Amino acid sequence: MAGRKGGRAKRRKVCYFTANGITHIDYKDVDLLKKFISERGKILPRRVTGTSAKYQRKLTVAIKRARQMALLPYVADE
């Protein structure tokens, strides 16, 4: 098996919330929450977004609350 050849150097992902100084994630801020949801409506994992564990937990709670209040869909339309 050959190793990886060429390609780009891996860039470290930075947490969006710590970089922008956001301490509170509001479930009513739908535009912000949509950045962390896939086109199918699923919550994107930390390894994709680069969000820290602390803010990933807060983000998950906010997305679930927004879904409960019908601000975000549970599944995306096809």
Curated annotation (Swiss-Prot):
It comes from the Bacteria. GO terms for biological process: translation. The keyword Secreted does not apply. Signal peptide: none annotated. SUPFAM superfamilies: Ribosomal protein S18. PANTHER family: 30S RIBOSOMAL PROTEIN S18, SMALL RIBOSOMAL SUBUNIT PROTEIN BS18M. This is Small ribosomal subunit protein bS18. The gene is rpsR.
